[in-house]
């Protein structure tokens, strides 16, 4: 067809994201991206031998649910000179710096109001993020792509479940519900916090400390502990 495929290569900058190890994606031991030191030679080879490709950009993503600007700044500062070099040598047009801006999970009761994302609640906001990375990115003269992800849709849904049984064990009380890790895996896999609130009001004196667990046949099937 005579059409060149536009491509961008993902670089692994080997930067610590400061998030859960399962959603850290920019360290040398992670499976994602091409080693930082190999990128320039890879682009040179592609420009020389893979003439059906159009080298359009460079991409990175260091992890998810980051709550500080420092890792983003460290990654951008490390990769920006590489992006500038690729622009000069190969004419790349964009630099995608990935996503990963974390959100607040503890404020679920207020998640229906705009203020949920404000400076008082969020550890990392769009303004602090931009203040950190823009000064390094602006001189590149490239289109900058960002992937906001959960920052946009994190409070868009709720899981509604029903308590089926209460088990009073010797060491713990368990509230067994009709939803589990197959519906919401973050607590079990990432030790993620999700606030649980009753749909109907109950007297405060009826509250007990318990694990909220699902029906899946393994001990990791929980939505909240204690």
Question: Where do the model's predicted regions map?
Answer:
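Active-site-proximal beta-alpha core segment in soluble small-molecule metabolic enzymes
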Residues: 1-96, 103, 164-166
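Flexible glycine/acidic-rich beta-alpha junction loops that bind and position SAM and/or redox cofactors
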Residues: 15-19, 93-114, 145, 150-156, ...
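Residue-level signature of transmembrane alpha-helix interfaces in integral membrane proteins
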Residues: 26, 75, 112, 116, ...
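Short secondary-structure boundary segments
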Residues: 33-48, 113-129, 194-198
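N-terminal low-complexity, intrinsically disordered patches enriched in charged
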Residues: 35, 42, 66, 72, ...
């Amino acid at each position: 067809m005579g059409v060149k495929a536009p491509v961008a290569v993902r670089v692994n900058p080997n930067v610590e994201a400061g998030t859960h190890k399962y959603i850290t994606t920019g360290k040398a031991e992670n499976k994602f991206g091409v080693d930082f030191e190999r990128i320039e030679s890879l682009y040179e080879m592609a420009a020389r031998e893979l003439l059906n490709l159009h080298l359009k950009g460079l991409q990175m993503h260091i992890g998810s649910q980051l709550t500080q600007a420092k890792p983003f700044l460290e990654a951008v500062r490390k990769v920006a000179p590489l992006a500038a070099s690729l622009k000069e040598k190969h004419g790349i047009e964009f630099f995608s710096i990935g996503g990963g801006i974390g959100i607040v999970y503890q404020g679920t009761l207020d998640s229906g109001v705009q203020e949920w994302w404000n400076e008082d609640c969020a550890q990392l906001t769009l303004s602090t993020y931009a203040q950190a990375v823009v000064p390094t990115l602006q001189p590149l003269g490239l289109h900058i792509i960002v992937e906001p992800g959960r920052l946009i849709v994190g409070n868009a849904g709720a899981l509604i479940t029903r308590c089926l049984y209460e088990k009073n064990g010797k060491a713990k009380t368990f509230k067994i519900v009709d939803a589990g890790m197959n519906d919401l895996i973050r607590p079990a896999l990432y030790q993620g916090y999700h606030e649980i609130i009753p749909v109907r009001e109950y007297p405060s004196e009826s509250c007990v400390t318990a694990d909220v667990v699902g029906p899946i046949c393994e001990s990791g099937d929980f939505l909240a502990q204690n």
